[in-house]
């Protein structure tokens, strides 16, 4: 049987992720106590009609006892020894985003009380869930994602991946906005010529032909793309051979509008020839569009 554990801090999008998995045919259980993981998998294995419980997804959060959370790695290893195909999806967002989401919904944080502020509860929750986050197969940073964008990302990364197949996400970002925390690899392409300084290109992005033409006139651009594809061609198979399910490769330039977008598009196009589940995401473009800058 396949078991996906969904975890993450409150407000990060666990319920949305679980709903997506339910739509994908998983039998879903919300807020399962860790102590019930073994009984659940045993029950699923003894079902006379096992098809219904062949794919299961459960969410685990900080409402579990702290001792059980601290002991999660032992339980995780024991579950894997039983032959369960186990995968962990961990969702998180930056502290400011979590604060804003709680203020917007006016929900009470499960760890807050008369002596613990919302900010303190969010910080404490991160520490409690560290045993799960460090074992995550897929770490999703939901900062800046709408509910619909999160649904699409989970659906594409989980549903589009065949068993034992490596799923790739190439994402562009701007260093001035911070490095995405869900990155497995981070590459800096700020050494490439910057189209921003050509005033005719400031409203364009790395997917627009004028910017593509500008960058491809420079031999350094082709060399950068070739070197990155060569490096990833060498090492991605090793990650796949070690049963890695997901890889997030982040490409950064100054603002996340021109150079990083172009390089991500080139890498995505190249690796789609060898990997069936390849996504390209441009983290800054929706924000630039919302501000009328592109």
Swiss-Prot record:
UniProt cross-references to InterPro entries, sorted A to Z: P-loop_NTPase, RapZ-like, RapZ-like_N, RapZ_C
Residues where ATP binds: 8-15
Matching Pfam families: PapZ_C, RapZ-like_N
Gene Ontology MF annotations: ATP binding; GTP binding
List of residues binding GTP: 61-64
Entry annotated with the keyword Nucleotide-binding: yes
Family stated for the protein in its record: Belongs to the RapZ-like family.
Protein's name in the database: Nucleotide-binding protein Maqu_2718
């Amino acid at each position: 049987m396949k078991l996906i554990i969904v975890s993450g801090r409150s407000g990060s999008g666990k319920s949305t992720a679980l709903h997506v998995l339910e739509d994908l045919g998983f039998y879903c259980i919300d807020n399962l106590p860790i102590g019930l993981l073994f009984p659940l998998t045993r029950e699923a294995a003894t079902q006379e009609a096992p098809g219904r419980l062949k794919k299961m997804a459960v969410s685990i959060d900080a409402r579990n006892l702290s001792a059980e959370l601290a002991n999660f790695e032992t339980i995780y290893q024991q579950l894997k020894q039983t032959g369960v195909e186990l995968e962990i999806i961990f969702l998180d967002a930056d502290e400011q985003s979590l604060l804003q989401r709680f203020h917007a919904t006016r929900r009470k944080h499960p760890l807050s009380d008369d002596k613990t502020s919302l900010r303190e509860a969010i910080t404490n929750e991160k520490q409690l869930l560290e045993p799960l986050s460090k074992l995550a197969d897929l770490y999703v940073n939901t900062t800046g994602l709408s509910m619909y964008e999160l649904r699409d990302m989970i659906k594409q990364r989980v549903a589009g991946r065949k068993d034992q197949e490596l799923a790739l996400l190439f994402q562009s970002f701007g260093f001035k906005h911070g490095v995405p925390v869900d990155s497995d690899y981070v590459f800096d392409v700020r050494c490439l010529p910057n189209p921003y300084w050509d005033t005719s290109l400031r409203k364009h992005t790395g997917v627009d032909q004028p910017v593509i033409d500008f960058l491809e006139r420079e031999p350094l651009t082709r060399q950068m793309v070739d070197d990155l594809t060569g490096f990833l061609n060498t090492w991605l198979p090793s990650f796949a051979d070690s049963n890695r399910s997901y890889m997030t490769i982040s490409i950064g330039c100054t603002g996340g509008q021109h150079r990083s977008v172009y390089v991500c598009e080139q890498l995505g196009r190249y690796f789609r020839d060898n990997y069936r589940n390849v996504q390209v995401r441009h983290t800054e473009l929706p924000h630039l569009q919302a501000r009328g800058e592109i």
